[in-house]
Design a protein with these regions (language model features):
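Extracellular Cys-Trp
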Residues: 1-76
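Structured, hydrophobic secondary-structure cores that serve as assembly/anchoring elements
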Residues: 65-228
Length: 228
């Protein structure tokens, strides 16, 4: 198992191959990981992080992403690698970069930090909104997909009858797992009504439906000041 894949080269064809591989593995094989590339916002996918600063920061970003906890954001995380990178940009450049889906670094008091922990997804729509551009949100969703699959494989696959009692046991275990995620503040507002475990088309099939509210980190502060 692995959590992140990285390539810091400049070859556009190779980048596209990485993106296509990532999409196929995530969407068709159910293997949840992220790929980190340098300056490739064209990926436009929640599973691909495009580092818009220096290429030298790609592998650090991949390592930090792979090691991040389910309730952790890399926003404002200090870079502790060995490279010296010039990350001084105009405010307008940072704004443009974020809109393009670039993960950028900024410098504060001599320390390099992650501006916002985002991925390259920018094609927001009603069915898939801007929440999916947050790496913390994607981290939560990927963790749930991986962990529920592991629970099923370890305790239920070929071991439990696919009847009402067996499905209720699976539901109870998944619910307990989500309660732990709420304690970690990875998700919020989850109740037993937000999950259903049903029999699928075939006798051996089980289908799980969930409604999830991932928690994200504070990133923007808006203030209203009243002058009396």
């Amino acid at each position: 198992d692995f959590n992140a894949l990285a390539y810091n080269g400049a070859d556009e064809k190779t980048k596209k191959l990485f993106v296509n591989f990532t999409k196929r593995m995530r969407e068709e094989e159910g293997v949840k990981f992220v790929t980190v590339l340098h300056d490739y916002p064209a990926a436009d996918h929640e599973g691909v992080i495009s580092v818009g600063t220096a290429a030298e920061l790609v592998y650090w970003t991949a390592g930090a992403s792979a090691g991040a906890e389910v309730n952790e954001s890399l926003t404002n995380t200090a870079y502790d690698g060995e490279y010296e990178v010039d990350a001084k940009l105009k405010k307008s450049d940072y704004i443009k970069g974020i809109r393009k889906g670039q993960l950028l670094f900024y410098e504060e008091d001599g320390t390099l930090r992650v501006l916002r922990d985002i991925n390259s997804f920018t094609s927001f729509a009603a069915a898939k909104n801007s929440d999916f551009s947050s790496n913390r949100v994607v981290r939560v969703l990927d963790s749930i997909a991986n962990d529920v699959a592991n629970i099923f494989s370890k305790y239920y696959l070929g071991k439990q009858s696919n009847n009402a009692n067996g499905r209720n046991l699976l539901k109870a275990e998944i619910l307990a797992y989500h309660e732990e995620l709420m304690k970690l503040e990875a998700i919020e507002g989850f109740t037993a009504d937000d999950i259903t475990v049903e029999k699928g088309t075939e006798k051996q099939d089980v289908v799980v439906y969930e409604a999830i509210q991932p928690v994200d980190a504070m990133e923007k502060l808006y203030m209203k000041v009243e002058v009396a």
